[in-house]
Amino acid sequence: MKKTVMAMLTLLALTTASAQESKTPLVYDVENTGSKFAAPTMPAADQLPVIRELPDALEGVKKFKGWAKRRSDIGHMIQHYGIGTKPAVKPEQVKARMDGDTLVVDVTVGQEVLTLKSHIRYPKTGQAPYALMIGTDMIALPRQLFEDRPIATATFVSAQVNDYKQFGKHHDRGEHNFDRLYPDLKDNGAYSMWAWGMSRLIDGLQQLGPEVTKIDTKHIGVTGCSYAGKMALYCGAFDERIALVIAQEPGGGGAAAWRKSHESTLAGKNLEDIDKTDYHWFLESQKENFRGDSVYRLPYDQHELCAMVCPRALLLLGNPDYEWLADGSMLPSAEAAKKVWERFGIGDRMGWSIVGKHGHCRLPETQFPEVQAFIDRFLLGRDVKTDNIKRVEDL
């Protein structure tokens, strides 16, 4: 009798989880489902409470329907304290066209126009409309992962919005193309600007439709490595039309928790913490307000940036050979973020693979299976298992 009851309970649990997952969207057709929610109160930095552990990403959330508001609150906090405002754009401000295989998007704000261009490389297999993987400045993932799959690829050229790069010439803060459109947001960090630019490309794809672009806008992924891995994560977190985010070796300011990196710095490690990151990417006030032990006053941490991707799919790729990348801080952040997906019965939509013994941004073949599984399931809709992708080696 006991065995029968246990079997029935197990079946009921599995059925409930399956039903819950089937009702949870894989992607949305709007950039921000939380646009109707007002921003929460934003205290001055020195009035924020000290939070030693990673903040609770699910604070106040009991069911999935409550996640939209919590996700919106997290997004507002990240913009206010971390990267600056990502401004909304009305459909009539965007005009898109195809020039051969190049998507061209003109965005008008006031009297200013910013033009984005992205060449689309169509696959040699399959039929349109195709899934699309967009690389933030480039796709660092090996080409063979896409060559035999019906997935188009494109590049978001970040310099068209903000041309900052760590090496070489670039404009100063307040002098970028984005700043022509939004002079009041000249203090923004690059990641808010780049996320804005990615969203405008997706606006263009939606506006033209699959008949013109040959792209299935329900199956768009973004990926990048290093600084561009952070970029991919911010783009995916702040645009719910992106079905899959693959953040490759994103380092500090990406998936690695600021709090954990601060503690590792105190322990003698040399990594990208909130004091040593590149402040062209973030609000300069973030360093002023949250340097050193003040990081514990930050009302969020990077696990919540990751969690903003939920209920969509996220794969984090690490490389512990490079201490600077702070994978020891990314792992607890990833574990904390995954609890959000798990709460809603969709834990198999988020995973990580942290493996060393290879160059920076050079994914080894040993990590191909994890990437292939996420691409196949979330871009191509194939029946592939992605549960329990929590691989950690050499850390």
Which positions does each model-derived feature cover?
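Extended catalytic-interface subdomain
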Residues: 193-204, 223-225, 247, 284-319, ...
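Primarily recognizes the serine-hydrolase "nucleophile elbow" in alpha/beta-hydrolase
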Residues: 200-265, 294
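Alpha/beta-hydrolase-fold serine-hydrolase catalytic core, especially in secreted/extracellular enzymes
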Residues: 20-117, 122-128, 240, 310-395
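Mobile cap/lid helix-loop segments that gate and shape the active-site cleft of serine hydrolases
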Residues: 247-305, 326-334, 342-347
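Structural recognition of the beta-strand scaffold that forms the well-ordered cores
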Residues: 132-135, 152-157, 221-223, 243-248, ...
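Sec-dependent signal peptide recognition
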Residues: 2-7
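Cap/lid segment of the alpha/beta-hydrolase catalytic domain
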Residues: 135-218, 251-260
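Hydrophobic h-region of N-terminal signal peptides that target proteins for export
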Residues: 10-18
